[in-house]
């Protein structure tokens, strides 16, 4: 249903306004309702898909496309096949104006490192739903540090908690997908991973 709605709106409204003041705001509201346990995963997935389709239609009317705020590499930890959370976060990052390099699920540490070296993102995110796989994020962050790459490494997913995410150098935590763009904004504003940890509660606010 979103296709005809966006197409009709484009007759009188600029595409960026449709994206930023319509679709993105709508998804932010969905994120709040999810945090309040009014919406659950099925509603989040449906809203994310609707928003993705709507943004794709609106973006086609922007000469040269939208200017990217920055690049982020996203993946699911090695050995872990669960990618729903990562997919939702990726949609929310794209809708917020970021270029997402989505590596998919069960991504080997060397592949993550190689992608970071090639793409030069300002942030790398990993998710894990299994406790047996979350250690790959800690190991991956160590490889980046050893190579002199000091970008924040966001750890997320059902198996991950804040204590784990902040137990290794570069590590920061995201509890829910809607928090990812909020944290990304602070990184672009100059916050390093230590500053993100220090102000985490204020950054994520009510999400």
Where on the chain are the PLM-derived regions?
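A charged, well-structured terminal subsegment
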Residues: 183-206
């Amino acid at each position: 249903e979103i296709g005809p709605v966006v197409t009709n709106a484009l007759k009188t409204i600029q595409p960026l306004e449709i994206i930023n003041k319509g679709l993105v705001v709508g998804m932010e509201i969905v994120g709040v309702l999810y945090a309040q346990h009014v919406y659950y995963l099925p509603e989040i997935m449906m809203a994310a898909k609707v928003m993705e389709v709507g943004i794709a239609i609106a973006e086609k009317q922007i000469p040269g496309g939208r200017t990217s705020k920055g690049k982020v590499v996203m993946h699911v930890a090695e050995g872990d096949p669960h990618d729903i959370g990562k997919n939702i976060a990726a949609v929310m990052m794209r809708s917020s104006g970021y270029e997402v390099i989505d590596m998919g699920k069960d991504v080997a540490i060397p592949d993550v490192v190689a992608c970071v070296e090639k793409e030069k993102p300002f942030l790398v995110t990993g998710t894990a739903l299994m406790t047996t796989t979350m250690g790959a994020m800690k190991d991956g962050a160590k490889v980046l540090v050893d190579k002199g790459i000091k970008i924040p490494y966001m750890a997320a997913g059902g198996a991950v908690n804040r204590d784990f995410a902040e137990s290794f150098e570069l590590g920061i935590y995201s509890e829910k997908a809607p928090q990812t763009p909020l944290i990304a904004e602070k990184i672009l504003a100059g916050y390093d991973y230590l500053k993100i940890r220090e102000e985490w509660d204020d950054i994520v606010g009510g999400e």
